[in-house]
Amino acid sequence: MTPSGRPRPLEASRAVKAESPAPFVLASASPRRLALLRQAGLEPSVVIAPEIDEALRKGELPRAYALRVAIAKIEAVIAKERGSFVLAADTVVAVGRRILPKADSEVDVELCLRLLSGRRHVVLTALALKPPAKPMRTRVVATRVAFKVLSKREIDGYVASGEGIGKAGGYAVQGRAEAFVRWINGSYSNVVGLPLYETLALLEGSGWVSARHRV
C-alpha cells in the first residue's frame, strides 16, 4: 500500500522484490544452471565463466573432485566480486569410484552410454557459495539414477543426435535420454545440473533470499 492507502502499482512492487542486499554472481558457464535459476525466479546480476584447471587428479574420488572444482570456480572470480554473493557448482557422473567424462566427442558419448547401460550411477553436484564478508559454504548433493539396458541402435541414435556433447556423463536427462531412465532417487534438477531445493536453502541460509524477498 502507498502512504495514501492506495494499492502499490504492480511494477513498483516487482521492483522492490527484485532488490537484493548485494549482487548475485553465478560463476558458471552452464546454460542449464542459469535456466534452472531463472525457473526458480532468481536472476543473477552477473554470470561469469571461470577459467580453471578441471583435470582429474590421480586417485581423486567423485565427491572430492566435484567439491574441489566448485571451490576453484569461486576462487577464480572472488577477487573481483568480494561484495557479492558468488555461487558456483560442479556436476559429475560416477559409476562406483569412476568419474565419467564430460563428453567432448561422439566417442566420449558412446563410451559413457555403454558404461551406463543397464547400471545404476550417481550424479553429484557440489555447491559452493561465498557470501560477502562471511566464510564460504559448501554442500554436495547426490542423486541415484538407473538406466535400462540400451541397444546398439539406441546408443548409435543418441550419439548421432549430438545431445550428449558437453554433458557430464554424456547424456541430458531433460532431453532424449530421459527415455533411458528406469528410475531416479533424489533431486531431478540435480541431474540436469543444479539441485534447486538445496541451492535455494544455501542462499536462504546465507541471508540472500530472505533479504531479496523483503518488501
Label each residue range with its predicted role.
Residues S4-R8:
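Intrinsic, low-complexity polybasic segments
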